[in-house]
A protein has these predicted regions:
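Conserved MFS/SLC helix-loop-helix module at the cytosolic interface between two early adjacent transmembrane helices
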Residues: 68-107
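Extracellular/periplasmic helix-loop-helix junction of adjacent transmembrane segments
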Residues: 39-68
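Cytoplasmic helix-loop-helix junction between adjacent transmembrane helices
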Residues: 113-152
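Extracytoplasmic
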Residues: 16-47, 236-241
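Helix-to-loop junctions at the C-terminal end of transmembrane segments
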Residues: 70-82, 269-281, 365
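Extracytoplasmic gate region of multi-pass secondary transporters
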Residues: 219-260
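Helix-loop-helix hairpin linking two adjacent transmembrane segments in secondary transporters
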Residues: 139, 147-194
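A late C-terminal transmembrane helix in Major Facilitator Superfamily
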Residues: 333-370
Length: 407
């Protein structure tokens, strides 16, 4: 069972601030999910330029590159200049660059707008998570993290389903209109979010300037596990449409519904995360995450037709717990004054895995076919689950516990 520092148990800023904080992770999920159902149509549109499938997949995942770079920078800027300022600026860029996909004239302009969107999303997600750490503590913080992932999964499921319908009705550009939903979130953040502790912000800024990276470097195993987790959790959205198109004839709406099953299950898994953590330690939860990815990915390959929805749903168990688990571990294992940068690297790891997904699958698909690639990569996750279980049995729940003090 997790043990949080006693002083954190009383830190609870209330439901309104929690709601605004979790809007960031929720709408950042649109960066990858909004155009997911449009991938086959987008691939046909760009097929004359070369390999339409890889072009479409990379237009979907290219924001990850900017996000990977921008997230640690935004964490540092938040520590130096205040998280509220970074949050508001990132919301404005999110709305403008996201909706630009409605009008982009060619692949190049679409790529530029998607890169800007990725940078805005990285700053938005990093700052939102850091604000959760500022405003909440202990099990309350873990519940807020879980609810944030749940809301993100709800938005992602809605985006996948609505995106498929929009593609069928209006073409592949239509899902980019979903990014306009960031405008009311920007307005709400303007009125609700204010620095909770002015003196703490100033202290953090001074410490950030000293280049104190040692507590962050110790977290590298957590970042590596999150990269692998993200490869698994995004498999239905990135590879699923192509697997479904290869194995059966389905409309974009039907494909979107099957892929959305992962996000729907993730909603419930994430909403229950705070309760799961009262029973299971972090290593045990990570083993559960890897098992769900492995079994779910293999089930998507092995089950026929619409029954693939069960594989997608199993993947949702891990998708609902992975991000909150790693974030909880980082809050516990790093001191307050590095949380901005530590969470920035968390976001970088999260989207590095998303960007790597097509490149991990590509050589396996070329060598063995897409269906066999699902089997092979799914089996690799099962092996990783077994390794985590063995580690848990030998070493115990070493990830649980408060951060070590750093002078």
């Amino acid at each position: 069972m997790s043990q949080s520092p006693a002083h954190e148990g009383d830190r609870n800023a209330g439901a309104l601030i929690a709601a605004v904080c979790i809007c960031g992770p929720a709408l950042v999920s649109l960066i990858g999910m909004a155009p997911a159902a449009a991938l086959p149509a987008m691939a046909k549109h760009f097929d004359q330029n070369g390999d339409g499938a890889i072009i479409a997949q990379n237009i979907r995942t290219l924001p990850s590159i900017a996000l990977i770079v921008a997230s640690p920078i935004s964490g540092f800027l938040g520590e130096r200049f205040g998280r509220r300022n970074v949050l508001l600026a990132s919301w404005a860029l999110y709305v403008i660059s996201g909706a630009a996909g409605l009008f982009a004239a060619d692949a190049f302009s679409l790529v530029i707008s998607r890169l800007i969107l990725g940078a805005a999303g990285g700053a938005l997600l990093t700052t939102s998570l850091a604000l959760i750490g500022d405003y909440f503590g202990g099990h309350t913080r873990e519940r807020v993290l879980g609810f944030g992932v749940a809301f993100a999964s709800l938005v992602a499921a809605g985006a996948l389903t609505a995106g498929g319908a929009l593609v069928d009705a209006f073409g592949w550009r239509a899902p980019f209109a979903l990014y306009l939903s960031g405008l009311p979130a920007l307005i709400a953040a303007w009125f609700v979010i204010h620095p909770p502790h002015h003196t703490r912000t100033e202290e953090n800024a001074a410490k950030a300037a000293t280049g104190d990276w040692a507590p962050i470097l110790r977290l590298w195993p957590l970042y590596a596990l999150l990269v692998l987790s993200t490869i698994g959790m995004y498999t239905p959205a990135i590879q699923g449409p192509f697997l479904l198109s290869e194995q059966s004839a389905m409309s974009a709406t039907a494909q979107g519904a099957i892929i959305a099953a992962s996000s729907i299950v993730a909603i419930f898994a994430a909403a229950l995360y705070g309760y799961i953590r009262r029973v299971l330690g972090l290593t045990s939860v990570l083993a559960l995450v890897m098992a769900s990815f492995g079994i779910g990915i293999m089930a998507m390959a092995g089950l026929p037709g619409a029954e693939k929805i069960f594989g997608s749903a199993i993947i949702g168990i891990g998708a609902g717990c992975a991000e909150a688990t790693i974030a909880s571990a980082i809050f516990l294992k790093s001191p307050d004054h590095v949380h901005g940068r530590a969470l920035g690297l968390l976001v970088s790891a999260l989207f590095l895995g998303q960007w790597l997904n097509p490149w991990v699958f590509a050589p396996v698909r070329e060598a063995a076919g897409l269906s066999n690639a699902f089997w092979i990569i799914g089996a690799a996750f099962v092996v990783l689950c077994t390794a985590l279980v063995a580690y848990r049995l030998v070493r115990g729940e070493k990830l649980d516990g408060p951060a070590r003090s750093v002078s």
